[in-house]
Amino acid sequence: MVEIGMGRTARRTYELEDVTIVPSRRTRSSKDVSTAWQLDAYRFEIPVIAHPTDALVSPEFAIEMGRLGGLGVLNGEGLIGRHADVEEKIAQVVEVAAKEPEPSAAIRLLQQLHAAPLDPDLLGAAVARIREAGVTTAVRVSPQNAQALTPTLVAAGIDLLVIQGTIISAERVASDGEPLNLKTFISELDVPVVAGGVLDHRTALHLMRTGAAGVIVGYGSTSGVTTSDEVLGISVPMATAIADAAAARREYLDETGGRYVHVLADGDIHSSGDLAKAIACGADAVVLGTPLATSAEALGNGWFWPAAAAHPSLPRGALLQVALGERPSLEQVLTGPSDDPFGSLNLVGGLRRSMAKAGYCDLKEFQKVGLTVGS
């Protein structure tokens, strides 16, 4: 703790960029490294989840993510469930963002498009397309709309439900309606639930006690895209937040006699090195936004924005162009080959090589690797 003034202290925290992996074991071949992990009954070959935003995940994108061994999460409150011509609507948003120098012009259009009511049939059809492809089907809803939307999604055949907001707690209190008690809500569902985001040990532990299969750390913070720091004064020191959630996971594992809750890191991961450091800090998998938005399959055509950018009264995100010209395939972004020396392509290959150099052969073991912090 540090004193920031008389009678007021604050905790010193660390970002992923502050942390460095320290290899200290016998090196091994990257071919002998496994990046597989399992969330409840669902096995994935790579520890990568696509951030649930219309700029990224369409049914086709989610299917390709599944084919490549990852998980694409559809935004259940996005434009896909509101407009039949969603690709045309997103093209309009991108056009405004590219032409208008004022960033609020594209935000206003996003807000207008999100003002259209959700159509359960459209949303159900999108879920059905993913399910019919034979990949794991996951949809994100906000805490305030979880109770209303979940029955439709379960009926459509989702495998995983993601309850995600900027910040989430085990119980959401509302003066204008019934509070959402996650423990009760999750216990009544037949599908596993992933919940987040959380920033600290206590909230992570509380969410684990609700019965969630996974806990998301962070809210997808990305420089130039997310503006929760500017709007709310809230930001996430990801290295510290991941390590705190991992400590909560160990505590809950002891408390329950063996129930393992997965920690998913969402924010400030831009390269394969960041991905490796997130796992090293204790994450089981990462949630990626801008790195995947550079792919040809991404719905935003080289642009990225978070779901919070469309909030009707307090947007907390901006539109950012992340790719120009010809874009790489999603397969190249995830598994290569790469011609980029800075780690933006072959993300999983970079992770595998980092694990091999450090002498570890699976993700859970790699969470024990040595770390240092720069001055």
Curated annotation (Swiss-Prot):
CDD domains: IMPDH (cd00381). Keywords: Isopeptide bond, NAD, Oxidoreductase, Ubl conjugation. SUPFAM superfamilies: Inosine monophosphate dehydrogenase (IMPDH). InterPro entries: Aldolase_TIM (IPR013785), IMP_DH (IPR005990), IMP_DH-rel2 (IPR005992), IMP_DH_GMPRt (IPR001093). GO terms for biological process: GTP biosynthetic process. The keyword Zinc-finger does not apply. SMART domains: IMPDH (SM01240). There is a cross-link at residue 99 (Isoglutamyl lysine isopeptide (Lys-Gln) (interchain with Q-Cter in protein Pup)). One of its GO terms (molecular function) is IMP dehydrogenase activity. Its EC number is 1.-.-.-. NCBIfam families: IMP_DH_rel_2. PANTHER family: INOSINE-5'-MONOPHOSPHATE DEHYDROGENASE, INOSINE-5-MONOPHOSPHATE DEHYDROGENASE RELATED. This is Uncharacterized oxidoreductase MSMEG_1603/MSMEI_1564. It comes from Mycolicibacterium smegmatis (strain ATCC 700084 / mc(2)155).
